[in-house]
Amino acid sequence: MKKIGIIGAGGIARAHATALSTIKNAELVGVYDINQQNAESFVKTFGGKSFENVDELIDASEGLIVASPNFCHKEHALQALGKHKHVLCEKPMAISLEEASIMKDTAERLSVRASMGFNYRYLSYVNILKSLIINNELGNILSIKVHFKKNSALRRKKFTWRDDANSKKTSGSLGDLGIHLIDMVWYLFESDFITESVRAKMNTNVKTKEDKQVLVDDYAEIYGQLKNKVFVNIITSKCSVPEDCGFSIEVVGHKKEFKYHTGNPHVYKLIDGLNVVDCPVPQSLLNDPPNEFYGWADSFRSELINWIASTQNDWVEIPSFSDGFRSQEVLEMFFEKDSNSQPMSVSAVN
């Protein structure tokens, strides 16, 4: 697969196009966006053709990157799959479990490579951690804390589709940022959450933009336990102060602890009692854009290389639409567990 088209011309599409430009034998055919002016601006920067019709872009491409708004993912992915094209769909997979199920079932019937945009699987420090877990260097794992804090809800004053109800909460901090963390926990441990153990909190702190009500969360906390007995804490935020922003992972094993924070991006810490060792993180190739964390741009490049390779070699593993469906299930369970909508009753103690 060489000829790749992109549906959508927003920020994530630009990250894909930047990464694609560094990959040998990969060609950006062009882009389709509902806003033709955005598409024209996109191709001036990245090359290719601005398509006025999504079907024409699909016909001209061997593989499609679906980087449109969440509520368009199902439509655009099915259009591409219907023409037997390879697909890489941005996260979250869809805006409902029903949509995700249709997408998964369609992909499974066809001889194409349908991948999810879970690019955090390709972060170097995540894969270092995975190797440490697999090789039992941390010992039996007790807990993982993974926090992703941004300030986009404070910076972005314009009301957009991310703030309204069309995406059914999937464009809030938990759906937008947390879906990566849900998949990452699965990628590291391959163990499901115990539903009864999960507690969730979702808040909307920036309540209006341009005098319109914001209908999604900008802060969420999740607590729960996996079936393999690992305790999990997930925090996502789009309303953090700059000094608190960043991406962090802490894993406690009975032998050692692993700690990483993008505030100190070039090292991760291995802690054994009082002994703390700073270990190097590989140097990144691409420059990360403002307000994104270390390794973010490289993760798109690795994701695309892997997806392209998978179209030529079946043994190459990719985050599949089945993985996307699983993460969508967990996300919807978290929504249902939100304490704002599901008050817990506390029995009196005599």
UniProtKB/Swiss-Prot annotation:
Please name the GO terms of the biological process aspect recorded for this protein, alphabetically. Answer: antibiotic biosynthetic process
Protein function: Involved in the biosynthesis of kanosamine (3-amino-3-deoxy-D-glucose), which is known to have antibiotic and antifungal properties, and to be a precursor of the antibiotic neotrehalosadiamine (3,3'-diamino-3,3'-dideoxy-alpha,beta-trehalose (NTD)). Catalyzes the oxidation of glucose 6-phosphate to 3-oxo-D-glucose 6-phosphate. It can only use NAD.
- How is this protein induced? Induced by neotrehalosadiamine.
Where are the coiled-coil regions?
none
Q: Which GO terms describe its cellular component?
A: cytosol
EC number(s) stated in the UniProt entry for this protein: 1.1.1.361
Enzyme class, UniProt record, top EC level: oxidoreductase
Annotated source species:
Bacillus subtilis (strain 168)
Can you state which reaction this protein catalyses? Answer: D-glucose 6-phosphate + NAD(+) = 3-dehydro-D-glucose 6-phosphate + NADH + H(+)
Please give the family membership noted in the entry: Belongs to the Gfo/Idh/MocA family.
Its Gene Ontology molecular function terms? Answer: glucose-6-phosphate 3-dehydrogenase activity; nucleotide binding; oxidoreductase activity, acting on the CH-OH group of donors, NAD or NADP as acceptor; scyllo-inositol dehydrogenase (NADP+) activity
The metabolic or biological pathway listed in the UniProt record of this protein is: Antibiotic biosynthesis; kanosamine biosynthesis
| Superkingdom of source | Bacteria
**Protein name in the entry:** Glucose-6-phosphate 3-dehydrogenase
Q: Does the keyword NAD apply?
A: yes
What gene is it encoded by?
A: ntdC
* Classification via SUPFAM superfamilies: Glyceraldehyde-3-phosphate dehydrogenase-like, C-terminal domain, NAD(P)-binding Rossmann-fold domains
DNA repair among the record's keywords? no
